[in-house]
């Protein structure tokens, strides 16, 4: 990755672990996770982790939430969900206060933004939330 002007690398469940070389210490590593166990496993090796699906998908029919609110609260209480963990899956503007209260460091919004009647206004509202 150091041969290209990338700011980082995003890993998925099928990706091998990525070990930074000496020249790559400033790059950001993020990873998609689909279980609390994966968050625990990769947290010390990544700058950011995306946990999904938190809510029922907005854009993928039949793709439901994988975690109960109780499970997420317990993970937050144990320090597993924190500022390094971003919520993904079914996230909309209305979810932001709940995600913040559960300890997520942020959220990735896809379907709600894609389906917004006024995406620019919706994005601005998200950024101000």
Q: Which functions belong to the PLM regions below?
A:
Residues 1-33:
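Glycine/small-residue-rich loop that forms an oxyanion/phosphate-binding "nest" at active or ligand-binding sites
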Residues 1-7, 33-45, 75-81, 85-86, ...:
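Catalytic cores of alpha/beta
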Residues 11-21, 50-63, 96-129:
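Glycine-rich phosphate-binding active-site loops on the catalytic face of alpha/beta enzymes
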Residues 18-19, 73-76:
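A short alpha-helix capping/helix-coil boundary motif
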Residues 25-26, 59, 82-83:
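Short, contiguous strand/loop micro-motifs
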Residues 28-43, 47-60:
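Internal catalytic-core helix/loop-beta-alpha segment
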Residues 29, 66, 86-87:
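Residue-level marker of alpha-helix boundaries and capping positions
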Residues 64-73:
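Charged helix-capping and loop-helix junction motifs
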